[in-house]
Amino acid sequence: MKVVVATTQDLFVRGGGATYHAEGLATALTALGHEVETVRIPFGWRHKYEVLRQAYQWRMLDLRETGADLVITLKFPAFYVRADRKRAWVLHQHRPLYDNFDRPEYSAFSSSIPEDVAIRDAVVRWDTAYLGEMERIFTNSRTVADRLREYNGLEGEPLYHPPPLAARLRSGPFGDYVLWVGRLEANKRPGLLLEALALTKSRVRAIVAGRGPLEDALREAAAAKGLEGRVELRGLVSEEEKIGLYAGARAVVYPPFHEDLGYVTLEAFLAGKPVITMADSGGPTEFVRDGVNGFVARDAASLASAIDAYAEDPDLAERHGAAGRATYAETIPSWDTVCQRLLEGA
């Protein structure tokens, strides 16, 4: 079968979940004997009001009569492409115009600005119409499916997939640190880790692996809270370093706000480590079972208590980590199974 994978591209950005998602799918389809082309159009804007122009570019892209048997779209606004047959596997929509609208910490769009409201209404209308053209709609999590139902009245089938380092992650000793992995930006809430550490009874260390716009602020906050000796900001680490950090962690702290899926949870479970997340973290809560394979905290104080529980009892961390590995095995399909689901009946 000739399959087109259609998605967006961030120029000069290497890695990232969306990039891996597209590359992983294309590689898996090719391994199964399909002929695959990946179509990417850069998505980004110098000004927030360029979002409609960016969306319109995708609607102008016509893949009909190109010989493609099926087009699989992944990310807004690739859903808008014209094709004889298309299916969506939705990573997420343009969240600044959806659940993050009117949240200044996560979105530049506000209901107090008429132009912003008009853009939001247009994108919601277009998403509903063009996703409605799909033969089938899949999502990468229940969280994304719930948003699609709430805002667009469309049903999506949650379809999980393996994380980037799935074949290479390994378990190791339960060391003296908790690990935080990801970009240092507002929606990942790295500041919550520092708030919690300041409240812990134990002197457990934290290693932060990642870079982003909040890096300097995080370093200043650690100093202000007297945590300099307990918080190590590693910056951007290599894949091998990340694998080693997962292997040696006591637990992984992952508290994003309404995350779509969250590879960190899955990677931690593959490394046999428990995960501490938040009740409003979205995707991670689809996997983390409170008191079974991790903890689901509700505020900085309960996050601190969860960190202390693992710091004081490495056997508990080991039991929860083993349960996390079992959760992964029960929940996450192989890439072959993912491809079979996406192409079923095509």
Annotated model-derived regions:
Residues 236-237, 244-249:
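Short alpha-helical donor nucleotide-sugar binding micro-motif in glycosyltransferases
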Residues 109-137, 145:
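Membrane-proximal helix-turn-helix segments that form the acceptor-binding/catalytic region
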Residues 289-301, 309-315:
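Conserved acidic donor-binding segment of nucleotide-sugar-dependent glycosyltransferases
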Residues 219-237:
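Nucleotide-activated donor-binding/catalytic signature segment of Leloir-type glycosyltransferases, i.e.
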Residues 257:
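Aromatic "clamp/platform" in nucleotide-sugar-dependent glycosyltransferases that forms part
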Residues 274-278:
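Short hydrophobic beta-strand element within catalytic cores of glycosyltransferases
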Residues 312-345:
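A charged, aromatic-enriched C-terminal amphipathic alpha-helix characteristic of glycosyltransferases
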Residues 168-201, 207:
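Conserved donor-binding/catalytic core segment of Leloir-type glycosyltransferases
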